[in-house]
């Protein structure tokens, strides 16, 4: 039953797992003997009975699968809520009736997000925090638990991306430290702070915004992808420990989103990317269905390709490595305007591999 529940399948299926189902009409025939009533063959009416059950009696028909049903009255903490995906998600869940806790560094931007939520009739609270500072995370988490008692849904969205080839990273160890600090260690520290209350209440949902990069291994993103992959692995490991506590973990391998995080890479202006609102819709669906993983078809294909043909995958990615050069900023030059526009081949490749960070 537990395995079926984790797979999102009806618990009733467990009765059909270990042995075949048999239908015996012996008792019915005995009861009807002499009455002139005969038992019809099962195949003549079984489909009608099953169809009636599916249309009228299936308990799943009566479940409210709306975002409002998933979040109304719940406390939802969103990191990186001052802009981009975080802001779009905050506006969406607040509109569905959640109490939203807005977490980010920029107080001005947080206040602007809160004003939009309140103007729409929602409820939001600001908890300013530098999510790359472990001590500040501890302070913020204590503040949240003091004021709100618990968090029902945690969305670890705040992140830092660095696009730089390994050839330009020999003397930039701090790039790896910075991405690990925010994308992995900061998220883990917040989870550790909020998890005891979730376990104590026997309910909770942690949503980690990862990247399609952990599936597709795009060149020049070694620092960024490694930090996201660390959080993915952490989530997979602790998920089994939290089953009995009814705390769910969801990893979203987000494709390229047009947010301030990708703005410094000018060539992305010409590449296909989803909007923050579309990303927020992915997160909203995760809140409703609580899946283990949310990913695009291209991301899943990239993961499969690397699993079955890693060298072929490397060859394909090497083509991308040659098509998309390091930016002037990655080379340490401040004049980003000197970046050459991407070639026709590069733009075509980016559209073919829509959503991947190049």
Locate predicted features.
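Residue(s) in the substrate-gating loop at a strand-loop-helix junction
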Residues: 211
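C-terminal helical subdomain
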Residues: 251, 268-307, 311, 315, ...
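The beta1-alpha1 cofactor-binding region of Rossmann-like NAD(H)/NADP(H)-dependent oxidoreductases
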Residues: 128-139, 173
């Amino acid at each position: 039953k537990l395995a079926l529940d984790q797979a999102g399948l009806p618990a009733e299926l467990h009765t059909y797992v270990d042995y075949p189902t048999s239908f015996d009409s012996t008792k019915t025939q005995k009861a009807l003997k002499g009455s002139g009533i005969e038992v019809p063959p099962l195949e003549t009416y079984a489909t009608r009975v099953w169809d009636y059950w599916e249309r009228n009696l299936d308990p799943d028909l009566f479940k409210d699968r709306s975002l409002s049903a998933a979040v109304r009255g719940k406390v939802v903490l969103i990191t990186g809520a001052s802009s981009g995906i975080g802001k779009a998600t905050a506006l969406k869940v607040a509109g569905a009736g959640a109490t939203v806790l807005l977490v980010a560094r920029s107080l001005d931007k947080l206040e602007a997000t809160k004003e939009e939520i309140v103007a729409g009739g929602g409820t939001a609270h600001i908890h300013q925090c530098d999510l790359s500072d472990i001590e500040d995370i501890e302070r913020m988490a204590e503040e949240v638990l003091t004021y709100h008692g618990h968090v029902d849904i945690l969305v670890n969205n705040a992140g830092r991306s660095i696009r730089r080839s390994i050839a330009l990273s020999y003397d930039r160890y701090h790039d790896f430290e910075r991405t690990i600090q925010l994308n992995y260690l900061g998220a883990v520290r917040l989870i550790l702070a909020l998890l005891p209350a979730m376990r104590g209440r026997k309910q909770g949902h942690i949503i980690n915004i990862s990247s399609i990069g952990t599936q597709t291994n795009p060149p020049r993103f070694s620092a960024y992808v490694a930090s996201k992959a660390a959080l993915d692995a952490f989530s997979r490991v602790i998920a089994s420990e939290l089953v009995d506590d009814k705390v769910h973990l969801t990893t979203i391998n987000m494709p390229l989103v047009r947010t301030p995080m990708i703005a410094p890479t000018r060539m992305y202006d010409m590449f296909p990317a989803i909007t923050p609102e579309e990303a927020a819709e992915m997160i909203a669906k995760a809140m409703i269905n609580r899946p283990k993983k949310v990913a695009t078809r291209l991301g899943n294909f990239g993961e499969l390709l690397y699993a079955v043909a890693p060298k072929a995958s490397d060859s394909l990615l090497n083509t991308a490595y040659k098509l998309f050069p390091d930016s002037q900023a990655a080379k340490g030059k401040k004049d980003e305007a000197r970046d050459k526009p991407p070639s026709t081949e590069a733009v075509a490749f980016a559209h073919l591999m829509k959503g991947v960070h190049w």
